[in-house]
Amino acid sequence: MSHILDTINTVYPFPPKPIPLRDEEKQAYIAEIKQLLIEKDAVLIAHYYTDPEIQALAESTGGFVGDSLEMAKFGNRYPATTLIIAGVRFMGESAKILTPEKRILMPTLEAECSLDLGCPADKFTEFCDAHPDHTVVVYANTSAAVKARADWVVTSSIALEIVEHLDSEGKPIIWGPDRHLGAYIAKKTGADMLLWQGECVVHDEFSADALRKMKALYPDAAILVHPESPASVVELADAVGSTSQLIKAAKTLPQQKMIVATDKGIFFKMQQMVPEKELIEAPTAGAGATCRSCAHCPWMAMNGLQAIAQALREGGKQHEIFVDEALRVKSLIPLNRMLDFAEQLNLKVKGNA
């Protein structure tokens, strides 16, 4: 069973949309970035949810496109001394936690995540302290400070196994921050879980009613859903999983049409894997002016070519990630606990969001 905390009604201030670049401007920035990557001994590492041109640039320059944990692990083993992380801030922190000796740059440190914003370390710590008999399990989409308070850090592809393990030991669990993913895991495992009430602004907008109507238009299509979506949406899915798992499902499922309920940035990599299939954006609760994220993270959209070039060119406090060493060491403990658990299960850990 699970115990639901009171919903935290937070309206997140979205950043302004980036100003579109002309084609000649794009080509000039791409050329500059390629040169700067060489000069700075840097590699570009991008998340699946960044814009397609950023993912393409990462791949064409020998960098990497993946989920948050894959990004951090790639940066850890890649020989470059500077990592430029195109994603949101907790991803840069994760890279610094795993690879403290390298310089970690981001196009902007203002690229937030609603899951991170909705789980402030002081309030979360206060809640955890009020339930000292609970094991604290947090999603990777959290700050270094929240990770440091946790007993376990998990990604969406291994969360079920870890919660099942803890439940088998009779341990009640505090789960944070995503309420939808937490409810999905609680339903699957039957574990005793207290759920922090955060949400991803992108996945929270997907609508079951609208999805049913779309399915009626495409009756032969498979529905792929990220578990950060509401339960009513997850119930309609043919496949539920993390970003990496959804890409794999698109390839393994026999259907030639896929309705995809996650950030539309995933379409770049997914279409690479299944060029012969038709990918369809799942509908959000609103359309046009009435949707907020409109199936694309507004903070991911801040990782533009101009910002990447500026980060490489200038560096400095407005671009570089720093994590207090004591906090880094403490947050590494629950992260390593997950990695060790995955290794024991002989699982390849792939992550979140």
Curated annotation (Swiss-Prot):
Binding positions for [4Fe-4S] cluster per the UniProt entry: C113, C200, C297
Cofactor note: Binds 1 [4Fe-4S] cluster per subunit.
Residue sites binding iminosuccinate per the record: H47, S68, Y139, A140, N141, S156, H226, P227, E228, T243
Keywords: 4Fe-4S, Cytoplasm, Iron, Iron-sulfur, Metal-binding, Pyridine nucleotide biosynthesis, Transferase
Enzyme class: transferase
Catalytic activity entry: iminosuccinate + dihydroxyacetone phosphate = quinolinate + phosphate + 2 H2O + H(+)
A GO molecular function held by the record: 4 iron, 4 sulfur cluster binding
EC number: 2.5.1.72
Principal cellular location given in the protein's record: cytoplasm
Compartments in which it is found: Cytoplasm
Entries under InterPro entries matching the protein: NadA, NadA_sf, Quinolinate_synth_A_type1
Top-level taxonomic group: Bacteria
Cofactors: [4Fe-4S] cluster
UniProt record, GO biological process: 'de novo' NAD biosynthetic process from L-aspartate
Pfam families xref list: NadA
Pathway: Cofactor biosynthesis; NAD(+) biosynthesis; quinolinate from iminoaspartate: step 1/1
Family of the protein in this entry: Belongs to the quinolinate synthase family. Type 1 subfamily.
Protein name according to UniProt: Quinolinate synthase
Annotated source species: Vibrio cholerae serotype O1 (strain ATCC 39315 / El Tor Inaba N16961)
Gene: nadA
